[in-house]
């Protein structure tokens, strides 16, 4: 009988040959998912039988199907968000922006009116809404397929979030709350067009990832909506490509309606977020 330990060894070798960046971790996460246990528990189950479906799941990963599609979830802080084909998979670095957002309003119950632009799976809004259950949140998404995933996550983790179908490049969007919002967050499409990225990237919806030759198309246009939404003194935080920090800061500076324009770094020290306040 093939043991789980032996199957993990073989799976790790298979995934390594396929170019997967973290073959052992992925193999263990697949096994833990199928066994219904935590990843750390795998070390105690090396002599167990191989769970049904393990070989097929490893083969899917070897074809560079995103691990999160195989597991059906993606971690976002304390949440395991539902994801699958048709929605952008949240990345760990976005938790930095989510944590920043919660800190901006956590101490003042009067300043908890928040908008998440380009919500995708609902990652930012769900994280914030789960942490601040009395917050008023609006989440905007253009893609109906992604919005379906977002609503599923809001229903489970942050039912107070109101999902809005709309285009964040339209400065008139959400006109009924213009000038009243305390905080805007966004993880918009920001990757420069390229055909040389990891295969998994291209399984996210193109419109959720890429934003023109320099990755700035959406950010350049959405700044006007952000300004319209925020009240004076309201804050904004945007995730961006690690090559465009200067360009994003320039967008807010040249607009003329923002001050306190600052950079946030991800956990590896890369400049990945710009924050600002409406004057």
UniProtKB/Swiss-Prot annotation:
Pfam families: MTS, PrmC_N. The keyword Methyltransferase applies. GO terms for molecular function: nucleic acid binding; protein-(glutamine-N5) methyltransferase activity; protein-glutamine N-methyltransferase activity. S-adenosyl-L-methionine binds at residues 141, 187. Its EC number is 2.1.1.297. GO terms for biological process: methylation. Gene3D superfamilies: DNA helicase RuvA subunit, C-terminal domain, Vaccinia Virus protein VP39. Keywords: Methyltransferase, S-adenosyl-L-methionine, Transferase. Methylates the class 1 translation termination release factors RF1/PrfA and RF2/PrfB on the glutamine residue of the universally conserved GGQ motif. Belongs to the protein N5-glutamine methyltransferase family. PrmC subfamily. This is Release factor glutamine methyltransferase. The lineage of its organism: Bacteria, Bacillati, Actinomycetota, Actinomycetes, Mycobacteriales.
């Amino acid at each position: 009988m093939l043991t789980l330990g032996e199957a993990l060894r073989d799976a790790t070798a298979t995934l390594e040959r396929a170019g997967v960046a973290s073959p052992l971790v992925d193999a263990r996460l697949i096994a833990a998912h199928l066994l219904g246990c935590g990843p750390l528990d795998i070390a105690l189950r090396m002599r167990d039988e191989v769970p049904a479906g393990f070989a097929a799941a490893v083969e899917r990963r070897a074809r560079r199907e995103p691990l999160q599609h195989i597991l059906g979830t993606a971690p976002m802080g304390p949440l395991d968000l539902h994801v699958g084909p048709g929605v952008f998979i949240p990345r760990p670095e976005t938790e930095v922006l989510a944590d920043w957002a919660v800190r901006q309003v956590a101490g003042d119950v009067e300043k908890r009116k928040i908008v998440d632009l380009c919500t995708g799976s609902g990652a930012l809004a769900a994280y914030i809404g789960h942490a601040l259950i009395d917050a008023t949140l609006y989440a905007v998404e253009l893609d109906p397929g992604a919005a379906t995933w977002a609503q599923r996550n809001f229903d489970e983790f942050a039912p107070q979030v109101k999902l809005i179908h709309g285009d964040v490049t339209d400065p008139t969007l959400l006109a009924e709350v213009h000038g009243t919002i305390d905080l805007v967050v966004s993880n918009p499409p920001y990757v420069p067009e390229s055909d040389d990225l990891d295969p998994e990237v291209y399984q996210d919806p193109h419109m959720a990832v890429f934003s023109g030759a320099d990755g700035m198309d959406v950010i350049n246009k959405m700044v006007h909506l952000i300004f319209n939404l925020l009240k004076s003194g309201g804050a904004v935080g945007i995730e961006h490509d690690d090559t465009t920090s200067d360009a994003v800061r320039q967008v807010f500076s040249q607009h003329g309606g923002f001050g306190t324009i600052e950079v946030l770094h991800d956990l590896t020290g890369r400049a990945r977020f710009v924050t600002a306040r409406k004057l």
